[in-house]
Amino acid sequence: MSTSAPIDEQLTDGAEALSAEEVIARMVERFHPRLVLASSFQQEESVLIDLLLKVEPGARIFTLDTGVLFPETYATWRAMEERWGIEIEAASGISLEQQAAEFGDELWKREPDRCCALRKVTPLKETLSGVDAWIVGVRRDQAPTRAGTPKIGWDEKHGIWKAAPLADWSERDVWRHIHANDLPYNPLHDRGYASIGCTHCTVPATDRSGRWAGSDKLECGLHG
C-alpha cells in the first residue's frame, strides 16, 4: 500500500462520464477480489449493493459495527443479507466496556472525534489495510465537505483507490432506483432521518446536520 498518489490513466480517464454501473464494473475488473464495498445501511448502500452484486456476485461487503447502531439498522443488515443471500462482514473496534474503562462514560458527548476514531476510523483502517480499493456511497450533494468527490480517485488517507459511483446522483435518483427495484432500505429514512449513524449521535434531519446535532461536526473521519 502506497500513500503517494499514483497516476493511473486507464483507471481514471473518462470516469466522470461513466454511469454508476460502469464505475462499479471498472473497479471490479481492475481490483476484485481486493475490492470492498463499505455499507452503513443507508439508502445509497441499498443501491450500491444491488449494482455491485449484478456485476460480481462474490463481491466483498463490510460494515462498521460500532455496537450502538439503531435496531432498525441491524434489521436492515439482516434484510439485505436475506435479500441477496450474502454475508456482510462486521468490522468493530474496542468494546464499549473497554472504551468506558479507558476514556470514561459517554465519550461521544465529551469527545465525539475520539469516539468516532475508536469505533469507526480504527476498524476501517484495519479493514482497508488488506485491500487495494473500496467503494463508498458518498454523494456530492450530501454536504459541502463532499462537493468535490470524484467518481474514482486516490484515497490519500488510506493509500488505496476509492470509488463513489453515486457521486453525481441526487437523493431522488437514489429513491427512484430503490422503489423501481423493490430494494430493502433502512426504515429510519421514513421517519425523517436523512443520515443515519449511531443512536447517541443521530437525530431526525433533512441532511447530515442530524448527525452530531448541536455541534459543527459533519464527518466522522472516514472520508476526510
Which residue stretches match the model-derived regions?
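Nucleotide-activated chemistry modules centered on ATP-dependent adenylation/adenylyltransferase
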Residues: 1-224
